[in-house]
C-alpha cells in the first residue's frame, strides 16, 4: 500500500513538473549523416538528403522536453560557425562516419577542437557511430580507439556515450533503437543537472550576446572610420580639382517627406545654378570664338598686306618698263629723219657715238620658261569598233581545168518530185 502511494506521488510530482526547453547541437564532418539522423528523429524519410549549407533547425517533443536541434553544416569552410552556438546548447550530438576510416584523423581534430572550447567543456556528449549498415564499418571499440575518445572526455570532464547506428534503417517510431537509446540518455543527463546547466547557459548566453554586440559596434566603428577617411579623401581631391563633387557623388540621405515650399525653393535654386553654369559655359565659348576670329583676322590682314606689297613691286616694274619703252621710241623717231636727210644729200657718214646708257626693255614673256607642249595622248586601249577595210578579191590557188569557168551561168536547180504532191499524181 505504501509503495503504491509512493509511486503515485512520484508520478504526480513528475506530472506537475514544467515543460523544459532544451537546445542540442548536431555536429560532425560533412557526409557523416547528420541531416539524415535529424530527419529520422523527427519522423521524416531520411534518404535523398542534400548537403547542409549553414544550418537547419528541427523541433520535437520528448517527454517533458521541448527539444530544438540545430543541424550545423560540417564543411571545412563552415565549421567556424559552430562556436556561435556553443553558449546556448545543453548537450552535443556528434555524428561520425564509421565507414570512412581515412577521415578519422580529421574527425578527431574537429572533436578535440570542439571539446577544448570553454563553453562546451563539461557538457554531455553523445557520439553516434553512423553507417553501420555499410561493409567495413568500424565497430564501437575501433571508433573509441581512433578518436582517442576516452582521453578527450576525461581531459575536458565531459560525460560521453557512444552508440553504433544506421540513420537510414528507419524513421519515426521505427527509428534505429541505438539512436533512440542515445537520445534518451542525453536528455536524462540534462534533466539530472538541469538547474546547473540552465544557470550556466543563461550566463554564457548573456556573455555571448554582449560579445556579439561589442563586435557589432566595433564593426560599425570601423565602417564609420573608413567612410570618414573616404569622405576626407574625396574632399581633398575635390579641392585639388577645383570642384565640389562630393555632394553630387555621395549625397547624404535626406528625409523624403519635406514641406512643399522647401522643395520648391530647393528646385529653384538648382535651376538657377544650372542656368548660371550654362551662361558661364556660353561666355567662355564666346570668348574663345572671339579670340579665334581676331587671330584669323590678323592673319588675313597680314596676308593682304603681303599681297599688296607684291603688287606694288610688280607695278613699279611695269611702270619702269613702260618708261624705258617710250624713251626708246622717241629716240628712234629722232634718229629716222636724220638718216633720211643724210641719204638724200649723200653726205659723208657721221660717226655716231655708241650710247651706253640704253637699257633693253625687260620682256617678262621671254624670261618666263616656255611651258612644254604636252605630248599627244596615247591611243585608247580597249574594245572598239574595227575599221572597215576592203579585203582583196579571193583568187583560186591553182588553174582550173575548164577555160570557160568564169562567167558561165549555173545549171538550173533540179527539184525532185515529192510524194503526194500535184506533179506526182498520175491519172491512168
Swiss-Prot record:
It is a lipid-anchor. GO terms for biological process: cilium assembly; dorsal/ventral pattern formation; formation of radial glial scaffolds; heart looping; interneuron migration from the subpallium to the cortex; left/right axis specification; neural tube patterning; non-motile cilium assembly. A lipid is attached at residues 8-9 (S-palmitoyl cysteine). Expressed in the developing brain. There is a cross-link at residue 329 (Glycyl lysine isopeptide (Lys-Gly) (interchain with G-Cter in SUMO)). It holds the Pfam family Arf. GTP binds at residues 28-35, 71-75, 130-133. Residues 207-287, 318-428 are annotated as: Disordered. Residues 371-381 have a biased composition (Pro residues). Belongs to the small GTPase superfamily. Arf family. It is linked to Joubert syndrome 8: A disorder presenting with cerebellar ataxia, oculomotor apraxia, hypotonia, neonatal breathing abnormalities and psychomotor delay. Neuroradiologically, it is characterized by cerebellar vermian hypoplasia/aplasia, thickened and reoriented superior cerebellar peduncles, and an abnormally large interpeduncular fossa, giving the appearance of a molar tooth on transaxial slices (molar tooth sign). Additional variable features include retinal dystrophy and renal disease. The C-terminal domain is required for localization to microtubules and the cell membrane. This is ADP-ribosylation factor-like protein 13B. It comes from Homo sapiens (Human).
Amino acid at each position: 500500500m505504501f509503495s503504491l502511494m509512493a509511486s503515485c506521488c512520484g508520478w504526480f510530482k513528475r506530472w506537475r513538473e514544467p515543460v523544459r526547453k532544451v537546445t542540442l547541437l548536431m555536429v560532425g564532418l560533412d557526409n557523416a549523416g547528420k541531416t539524415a539522423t535529424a530527419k529520422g528523429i523527427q519522423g521524416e524519410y531520411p534518404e535523398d538528403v542534400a548537403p547542409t549549407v549553414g544550418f537547419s533547425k528541427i523541433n520535437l517533443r520528448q517527454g517533458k522536453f521541448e527539444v530544438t536541434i540545430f543541424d550545423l553544416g560540417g564543411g571545412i569552410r563552415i565549421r567556424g560557425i559552430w562556436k556561435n552556438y556553443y553558449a546556448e546548447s545543453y548537450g552535443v550530438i556528434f555524428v561520425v562516419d564509421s565507414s570512412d576510416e581515412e577521415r578519422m584523423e580529421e574527425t578527431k581534430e574537429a572533436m578535440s577542437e570542439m571539446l577544448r572550447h570553454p563553453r562546451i567543456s563539461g557538457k554531455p556528449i553523445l557520439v553516434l557511430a553512423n553507417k553501420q549498415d555499410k561493409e567495413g564499418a568500424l565497430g564501437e571499440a575501433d571508433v573509441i580507439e581512433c578518436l582517442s575518445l576516452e582521453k578527450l572526455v576525461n581531459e575536458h570532464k565531459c560525460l560521453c556515450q557512444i552508440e553504433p547506428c544506421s540513420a537510414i534503417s528507419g524513421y519515426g517510431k521505427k527509428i534505429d533503437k541505438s539512436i533512440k537509446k542515445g537520445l534518451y540518455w542525453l536528455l536524462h543527463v540534462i534533466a539530472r543537472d538541469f538547474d546547473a546547466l540552465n544557470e550556466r547557459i543563461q550566463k554564457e548566453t548573456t556573455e555571448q550576446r554582449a560579445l556579439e554586440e561589442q563586435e557589432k559596434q566595433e564593426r560599425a566603428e570601423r565602417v564609420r572610420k573608413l567612410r570618414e577617411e573616404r569622405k576626407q579623401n574625396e574632399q581633398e581631391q575635390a579641392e585639388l580639382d577645383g570642384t565640389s563633387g562630393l555632394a553630387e557623388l555621395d549625397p547624404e540621405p535626406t528625409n523624403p517627406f519635406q514641406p512643399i515650399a522647401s522643395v520648391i525653393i530647393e528646385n529653384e535654386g538648382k535651376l538657377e545654378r544650372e542656368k548660371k553654369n550654362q551662361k558661364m559655359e556660353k561666355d567662355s565659348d564666346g570668348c574663345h570664338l572671339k579670340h579665334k576670329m581676331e587671330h584669323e583676322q590678323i592673319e588675313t590682314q597680314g596676308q593682304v598686306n603681303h599681297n599688296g606689297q607684291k603688287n606694288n613691286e610688280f607695278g613699279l616694274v611695269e611702270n619702269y618698263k613702260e618708261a624705258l619703252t617710250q624713251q626708246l621710241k622717241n629716240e628712234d623717231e629722232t634718229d629716222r629723219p636724220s638718216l633720211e636727210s643724210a641719204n638724200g644729200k649723200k653726205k659723208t657718214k657721221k660717226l655716231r657715238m655708241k650710247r651706253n646708257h640704253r637699257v633693253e626693255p625687260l620682256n617678262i614673256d621671254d624670261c618666263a620658261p616656255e611651258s612644254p607642249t604636252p605630248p599627244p595622248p596615247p591611243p585608247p586601249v580597249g574594245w572598239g569598233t574595227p575599221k572597215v577595210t576592203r579585203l582583196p578579191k579571193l583568187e583560186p590557188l591553182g588553174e582550173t581545168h575548164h577555160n570557160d569557168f568564169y562567167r558561165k551561168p549555173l545549171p538550173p536547180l533540179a527539184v525532185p518530185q515529192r510524194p503526194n504532191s500535184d506533179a506526182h499524181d498520175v491519172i491512168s
